[in-house]
Design a protein with these regions (language model features):
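A detector for short metal-coordination/catalytic motifs
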Residues: 45, 49, 56-203
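Short, charged, low-hydrophobicity "junction" segments
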Residues: 1-5, 38-40, 75-79
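A structural/positional concept
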Residues: 1-36
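Conserved, ordered domain cores of eukaryotic regulatory proteins
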Residues: 26-60
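Beta-strand elements of modular eukaryotic interaction domains
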Residues: 17-18, 40-41, 91-92
């Protein structure tokens, strides 16, 4: 089952560019710089291919707020209710900067597969500091690039910060919760089954 994790250039190219600029054209976890940008002043800075990716990798058919998956997301992840209500419909949240984060390749692949996650360090997380968690089948070749203290701070590099807000702590918290559940299932459960009523009632 294919996840639509990276915004396509057809309908998400503008938001992809805006979010990468918001994140300073660096991977927010590794601080690796975008190889497509002009050479950084700091010549010691590593470069790689970056992508602005969805925090919650929606399937195209699940982008309707009436879908069973979204009914269960609202029910079993209460904090998501306000996030969905604020954007009125799932599609409004899908192409929203709050649902997009900049990561390097191949880290964004692990993020999309829920093999790495960012947990808020406080209830309101106004400081946007997150604890990095790795999960089952994480690509261990990436370990040298991860922050030694296990913390990731998100910073908005835009002058007009309201135009492109930072990723939502609620969405990152939900992503982390799903990653933990998938980790506990030994990788034997896919996201569709995870978000089914029958499965969630057993958790």
């Amino acid at each position: 089952m294919k996840m639509a994790n990276r915004p396509s250039h057809g309908d998400g190219g503008d938001i992809e560019k805006a979010c990468m600029q918001r994140d300073g054209n660096i991977c927010v976890v590794t601080q690796v710089y975008d190889v497509h940008q002009p050479a950084p002043d700091d010549k010691s800075m590593l470069t790689s291919y970056l992508a602005a990716v969805h925090i919650l990798p929606f399937l195209e058919e699940e982008r309707s707020a009436s879908s069973g998956v979204w009914f269960n997301v609202r029910r079993y992840f209460p904090s998501m209710r306000s996030e969905l209500d604020d954007h009125h419909q799932v599609d409004g949240l899908y192409h929203n900067p709050r649902n997009v984060i900049t990561l390097m390749d191949p880290l964004y692949r692990d993020f999309g597969d829920f093999r790495v996650s960012l947990e808020p360090t406080s209830n309101n997380n106004a400081s946007h500091v997150y604890r990095l968690r790795t999960h089952r089948n994480f690509s261990t070749c990436l370990v040298p690039f991860l922050p030694e203290n296990g913390l990731v701070t998100l910073t908005n590099h835009n002058n007009e910060k309201d135009e492109c807000p930072l990723p939502s702590p609620v969405l990152l918290e939900t992503h982390a919760a799903i990653a933990q559940i998938l980790d506990a299932t030994d990788g034997s459960t896919d996201i569709r089954r995870l978000l089914s009523v029958k499965f969630l009632r057993r958790r």
